[in-house]
Amino acid sequence: MQHDHSAEPLSPGLYIVATPIGNLGDITLRAIETLRRCDAVACEDTRMTGKLLKHLGISKSLWRYDDHSDAKAREKIVAAISEKAVALVSDAGTPLISDPGYRLVRDARDASLPVTTIPGACAAIAGLTLSGLPSDRFLFAGFLPVKDKARREMLEKLAPVDASLIFYETGPRLLKSLAAIDEMLPNREISVARELTKLHEECRRGMGAGLMAHYQANPPKGEIVLMVGPPPEAAPDDTDAELMLREALETMKPSQAAGHVAKATGLDRKDLYSRALELKT
């Protein structure tokens, strides 16, 4: 007869457990089993994790932990890991990915304690798979800085990276970030994914001007994954420029569209304006 291990406690160690990013149905069977069998849960917000555990019918000791916790707090958890199975979770998604945890994992490994991962949902990866942007190479850069100057400086440093770029963003800051990307990383496709795995999930892809116009008319809500395609391999040809011009004309006057495409491509603004007038007639 096969022995049922589900009721047995886990071996001592740190268990990095991914949790849903919006849809509770996305939690894995292994994550549920780990949370059920562990001795305690280190979490970013005890209220958020408490709700998840209640939904799963699990009662556990919750220890608040984030990367602002001092060294003494980490020392206590590391000491406990030598004798107990401790699950590490964030409010949503995979711990350590723009969420607390790396200092705790580092300290546990430095102490030669067992560390394992129970993988699952990650908003950055979910957004990339929906975006339609190249996914063979990508760089996740967390949240863009709040201040405009720092935001532009960060984008300038990332401009040469030959990969799709992934950021997290909030609804109120999206337009400012789109404007900065349009300025610092011109002629690149941008994708905005929001409310991932939820009822009103949305993913839009386009150039900066078109996306800014859309979100000015439809202020976004919820958490956002903001993605930027890699640098173009070569200067756009006339066909590419016309496609950009057609898209820009959906939200701009001919003169504005010509200026936008000229800035992005380096093509002559007068020629683009003449073509824009032809396309409008």
UniProtKB/Swiss-Prot annotation:
Q: Which SUPFAM superfamilies match?
A: Tetrapyrrole methylase (SSF53790)
Its principal location? cytoplasm
Where is the protein localized?
Answer: Cytoplasm
The catalytic activity, as recorded, is:
cytidine(1402) in 16S rRNA + S-adenosyl-L-methionine = 2'-O-methylcytidine(1402) in 16S rRNA + S-adenosyl-L-homocysteine + H(+)
Keywords attached to this entry: Cytoplasm, Methyltransferase, rRNA processing, S-adenosyl-L-methionine, Transferase
Cellular component aspect of the GO annotation: cytoplasm
**GO molecular function (one):** rRNA (cytosine-2'-O-)-methyltransferase activity
What Pfam families does the record point to?
RsmI_C (PF23016), TP_methylase (PF00590)
> Which top EC class is given?
transferase
| Role played | Catalyzes the 2'-O-methylation of the ribose of cytidine 1402 (C1402) in 16S rRNA.
Annotated family: Belongs to the methyltransferase superfamily. RsmI family.
What's the protein here called? Ribosomal RNA small subunit methyltransferase I
